[in-house]
């Protein structure tokens, strides 16, 4: 018996991911993510990171298996519709331990958000930015 008897399937909006989603739905039966034991993510790194953030916000400890159908894909497995259940069973599990980033805007408003993979800082002006980073 599989460790993940109930799988959910999510795909990014891009056509390659949507095409792969249709292909997998013809082969396998999937459940809504709320009922799943694991989730298959079709897309790129950004899509997988969005999914991980969503799971963190919902406080769900749900394994995610990503297959690259996006632009980057460093965090993803190669796309292959064959033998999905066995690939999941053989996949090496990695636990993500996100850092919590507390951000204070110039208005004084503070935000605390999980930081997974990377943090990007963008400025709206050409003036020098003053940053304080505490780890």
Model-derived features: where do they sit?
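Short, charged N-terminal beta->alpha structural module
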Residues: 1-29
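Catalytic core of DAGKc-family lipid kinases
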Residues: 12, 70-135
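Short acidic low-complexity segments
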Residues: 28-38
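N-terminal glycine-rich "phosphate-gripper" loop used for MgATP/nucleotide binding
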Residues: 41-45
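Short glycine/serine/threonine-rich phosphate/pyrophosphate-binding segments
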Residues: 46-52
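Active-site catalytic pocket residues across diverse enzymes, especially alpha/beta-hydrolases
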Residues: 55-58
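Proline-centered loop/turn at the N-terminus of a beta-strand
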Residues: 62-63
């Amino acid at each position: 018996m599989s460790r993940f008897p109930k799988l959910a399937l999510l795909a990014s909006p891009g056509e390659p991911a949507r095409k792969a989603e249709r292909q997998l739905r013809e082969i396998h039966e999937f459940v809504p993510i709320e009922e799943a034991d694991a989730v298959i993510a079709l897309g790129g790194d950004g899509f997988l990171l969005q999914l991980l953030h969503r799971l963190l916000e919902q406080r769900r400890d749900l394994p995610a298996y990503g297959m690259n159908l996006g632009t980057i894909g460093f965090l993803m497995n190669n796309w292959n519709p064959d033998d999905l259940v066995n690939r999941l069973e053989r996949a090496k599990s990695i636990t993500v331990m996100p850092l919590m980033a507390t951000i204070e805007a110039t208005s004084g408003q503070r935000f605390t958000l999980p930081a997974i993979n990377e943090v990007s800082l963008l400025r709206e002006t050409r003036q020098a930015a003053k940053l304080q980073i505490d780890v």
